[in-house]
Curated annotation (Swiss-Prot):
It catalyses: UMP + diphosphate = 5-phospho-alpha-D-ribose 1-diphosphate + uracil. Keywords: Allosteric enzyme, Glycosyltransferase, GTP-binding, Magnesium, Nucleotide-binding, Transferase. This is Uracil phosphoribosyltransferase. CDD domains: PRTases_typeI. GO terms for molecular function: GTP binding; magnesium ion binding; uracil phosphoribosyltransferase activity. Binds 1 Mg(2+) ion per subunit. The magnesium is bound as Mg-PRPP. InterPro entries: PRibTrfase_dom (IPR000836), PRTase-like (IPR029057), Upp_B (IPR034332), UPRTase/APRTase (IPR050054), Ura_phspho_trans (IPR005765). Its EC number is 2.4.2.9. Its cofactor is Mg(2+). It is an enzyme of class 2 (transferase). HAMAP family: Upp_B. Pathway: Pyrimidine metabolism; UMP biosynthesis via salvage pathway; UMP from uracil: step 1/1. It comes from Clostridioides difficile (strain 630).
Length: 209
C-alpha cells in the first residue's frame, strides 16, 4: 500500500488557511498556492539520492553532496495543477514539465481527457503529478493510468487538500503511488466537492466561474 504524507508544517497550514478563506482573491490565491507547492517540495523530494563530489571552498578542498543526477518531471493536471508548477520548478529547475488535460463531467463526475503532452523520456523520470484538489480521485487515477500507459514507472502525487474518498480511490488502483497532501479534509459532499475544502481551485486560481 502506498503511503500518505500529510505535511503539517506551520507555514503550510497558515497559508492553507488563507487559501480556504472565501474572501481571498485570485492574486493572493495564486501566490499562496505557489508558496505552498514550494514548501511541500521539500517533503516530496526527501528521498532523492545524493552523491559525493570534491569541491574547493575559499578555505580548503572538501567532499560534499549534490543530487545524483536524477531525472525529474512535473506533470500538472490542467488546469488547476498549473498553479503548483512554479513553486516546484523553483526548487528543481532542471525538471521537465508535461501536461495532462482532464475535466470532471458535472453529471457523472468522471474525468474526460482533452490534452496530453509529455517529455519523450517520461519512462526514465521520477514523476510528480500535481493538482490542488484530490476529491473523488477520478482525475488522479485517470492521469496516472495515462502516464503508466506512456511508460512511466516512478510516480508521486501531490495535492493541497484531499478527501479520504479520493485517497482510497487512488490507492485502490495505484497502490505504488505515494500521496503528499497539505491537509486530509473531512469528506465529499453530494456534489463531489471536498468539505471544508477551498472551493473550485481552478476558478479561484484564474478568476473564472
Amino acid at each position: 500500500m502506498s503511503k500518505v504524507v500529510e505535511t503539517n508544517h506551520p507555514l503550510i497550514q497558515h497559508k492553507l488557511t488563507l487559501m480556504r478563506d472565501k474572501n481571498t482573491g485570485s492574486k493572493d490565491f495564486r501566490e499562496l498556492l505557489t508558496e505552498i507547492a514550494m514548501l511541500m517540495g521539500y517533503e516530496i523530494t526527501k528521498d532523492i539520492p545524493l552523491k559525493d563530489v570534491e569541491i574547493e571552498t575559499p578555505i580548503q578542498k572538501t567532499s560534499s553532496k549534490v543530487v545524483a543526477g536524477k531525472k525529474l518531471a512535473i506533470i500538472p493536471i490542467l488546469r488547476a495543477g498549473l498553479g503548483m508548477v512554479d513553486g516546484l520548478v523553483s526548487l528543481m529547475p532542471a525538471a521537465k514539465v508535461g501536461h495532462v488535460g482532464l475535466y470532471r463531467d458535472p453529471e457523472t463526475l468522471k474525468p474526460v481527457e482533452y490534452y496530453c503532452k509529455l517529455p519523450q523520456d517520461i519512462g526514465e523520470r521520477d514523476i510528480i503529478v500535481v493538482d490542488p484538489m484530490l476529491a473523488t480521485g477520478g482525475s488522479a487515477v485517470a492521469a496516472i493510468d495515462l502516464l503508466k500507459s506512456k511508460g512511466a514507472k516512478s510516480i508521486k502525487l501531490a495535492n493541497l487538500v484531499a478527501a479520504p474518498e479520493g485517497i482510497a480511490e487512488v490507492q485502490k488502483y495505484h497502490d505504488d503511488v505515494d500521496i503528499y497532501v497539505a491537509s486530509v479534509d473531512e469528506r465529499l459532499n453530494e456534489h463531489g466537492y471536498i468539505i471544508p475544502g477551498l472551493g473550485d481551485a481552478g476558478d479561484r486560481l484564474f478568476g473564472t466561474k
